[in-house]
Regions:
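Conserved, mostly hydrophobic/aromatic
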Residues: 17, 45, 88, 108, ...
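Flexible glycine/acidic-rich beta-alpha junction loops that bind and position SAM and/or redox cofactors
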Residues: 24-28, 47-59, 91-98, 115-140, ...
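A glycine- and small/hydrophobic-rich beta-loop-beta segment
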Residues: 87-89, 101-111, 118
């Protein structure tokens, strides 16, 4: 309801939701959100692990299968080619076996996230997990973090490559020079574009180009989309 009210405000061109737990989105919610044209088709859907056993240990209120079902509903509602998902993943949670990690790695790769924040589990006093048995050695947590990071970056590059040649609208954010800007598409793809005559805050039409490992190089289009 708040999103719908915000979309009705004149001058607001883009609405982007922050981090969401998958159990927060009902089918009705997804249908209503998909009808809001100003809502960016990008969702940061918190995952934490792609292994249901690990999710139970984390006391998350969903399984990997339930997460995948919500992601599929979002893709169906917004269009698979139009929607992008981002998430957070923890590796090395107490009790996570190599098999559990591999399962999480496969799940995360299959979801084709545009961006994944990967964190090694950090043991903190006062939390339930602090006293859990089978704590993972630091060197193993670091190794799993590297492996997960390499996998998600490969997927990120592949997803970005799939957007090459597409026309999109970019919100210009940080100026790198008087004419060169970084910015984001509605799908939260980071881009860099030469946009003489424009300034931060402008929304400009571009053609998505090559991915450089951090951003997509984009070319400014003369006409509005």
């Amino acid at each position: 309801e708040l999103v719908e009210h915000a979309a009705a405000v004149e001058g607001i061109e883009r609405i982007r939701l922050g981090s969401l737990d998958p159990d927060m989105l009902s089918e009705s919610d997804i249908r209503r959100l998909a009808a809001v044209k100003k809502l960016c088709p990008q969702f940061h859907l918190s995952l934490q692990s792609g292994c249901s056993k690990t999710l139970r240990a984390m006391r998350r209120p969903y399984t990997a299968e339930q997460y995948a079902a919500i992601a599929a509903r979002l893709r169906e509602a917004f269009g698979d080619e139009n929607l992008s998902l981002t998430t957070d993943v923890i590796v090395g949670f107490p009790g996570e076996t190599e098999e559990d990690f591999e399962q999480s790695l496969r799940f995360v790769s299959a979801q084709r996230f545009l961006k994944v924040h990967v964190f090694p589990y950090s043991r903190r006093k006062g939390t339930a997990a602090y006293d859990f048995p089978d704590q993972i050695p630091e060197h193993e947590k670091e190794a799993r973090s590297r492996r997960m990071g390499e996998a998600v970056e490969a997927v990120r590059a592949d997803v970005a490559a799939g957007m090459r040649g597409m026309h999109a609208e970019v919100l210009l954010e940080t100026p790198l020079s008087s004419t060169l800007f970084t910015g984001y598409t509605r799908q939260y793809l980071p881009v860099v574009v030469q946009a003489p005559g424009h300034q931060s805050g402008d929304i400009v039409p571009v053609c998505i180009g090559e991915w450089d490992g951090q951003r997509a190089k984009a070319a400014l289009l003369a006409a509005s989309l």
